[in-house]
């Protein structure tokens, strides 16, 4: 098993790699999101009020293979102002999902908000997916999406801080063709000697923003234990390796948008 020092070195190497990839993040990425579509015929949205959002929130019956829970209110998002104001929306959306402090605070300008946390029902998966619904005035919802695109286009947002929390490896991802418009991106942040990696998709449907945040933890010690187990002819625990970024399950996205 690797020593604690080598585990830290391994984690830092992931951070360095993320920082390197961040330099090209946002370049040539129309995938920072899909352009807003022409307004569709009006239909009731979950943004009509808190009770509507609660009814639209996911349950275990909506997505097979997942446990669905309410977020832990004891968690709290990073305190403090972003080091660069234009980068703030990228971190703010992490707090608009269902966990890691998300769901504990209503996003800025949102009228109401609900969050859920989804984990694999068999407890074998390593990815947690936070899902949040936030109701806005439609112009505010559109502006929130525009602010995300601006941040992803800015090279200054490849790495930034919110208080003492440093985010890095920011890069746009291909967004699903869902709702009126969508934006997807990834980033990472240190947690002690480990690295938390997050993939985020934000979909606007009218005045409602649906935020999906998939996350996993890169644990060098766990990876090494898995390798040692394989050498001994045993199964490892499936700890994500350095190149296994989390992914938002399309089934979760579809199930949630069907209820909005």
Task: Please identify what each model-predicted range represents.
Residues 11-19, 66, 71, 255-256:
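Compositionally biased, intrinsically disordered low-complexity segments
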Residues 11, 18-56, 78-112, 221-247, ...:
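N-terminal low-complexity, Pro/Thr-rich disordered segments
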Residues 51, 55, 67-205, 251-252:
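A small/polar (G/S/T-enriched), proline-flanked helix-loop surface module common
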Residues 169-260:
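A short, solvent-exposed beta-edge/loop patch
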């Amino acid at each position: 098993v690797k020593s604690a020092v080598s585990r830290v070195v391994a984690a830092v190497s992931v951070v360095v790699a993320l920082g390197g990839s961040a330099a090209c993040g946002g370049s040539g990425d129309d995938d920072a999101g899909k352009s807003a579509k022409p307004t569709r015929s009006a239909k009731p949205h979950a943004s009509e009020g808190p009770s509507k959002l609660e009814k639209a929130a996911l349950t275990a019956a909506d997505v097979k293979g997942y446990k669905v829970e309410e977020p832990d209110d004891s968690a709290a998002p990073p305190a403090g102002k972003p080091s660069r104001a234009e980068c703030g929306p990228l971190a703010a959306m992490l707090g608009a999902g269902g966990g890691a402090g998300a769901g504990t605070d209503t996003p800025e300008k949102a009228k109401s908000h609900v969050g859920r946390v989804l984990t694999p029902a068999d407890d074998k998966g390593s990815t947690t997916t936070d899902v949040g619904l936030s109701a806005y005035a439609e112009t505010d919802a559109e502006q929130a999406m525009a602010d995300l695109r601006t941040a992803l286009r800015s090279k200054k947002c490849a790495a930034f801080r919110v208080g003492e929390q440093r985010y890095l490896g920011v890069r746009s991802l291909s967004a699903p063709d869902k709702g009126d418009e969508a934006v997807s991106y990834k980033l990472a942040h240190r947690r002690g000697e480990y690295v938390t990696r997050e993939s985020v998709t934000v979909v606007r449907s009218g005045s409602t923003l649906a935020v999906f945040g998939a996350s996993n933890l890169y644990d060098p010690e766990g990876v090494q234990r898995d390798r040692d187990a394989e050498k001994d002819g045993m199964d490892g625990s499936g700890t994500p390796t350095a190149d296994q970024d989390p992914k938002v399950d399309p089934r979760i996205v579809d199930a949630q948008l069907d209820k909005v």
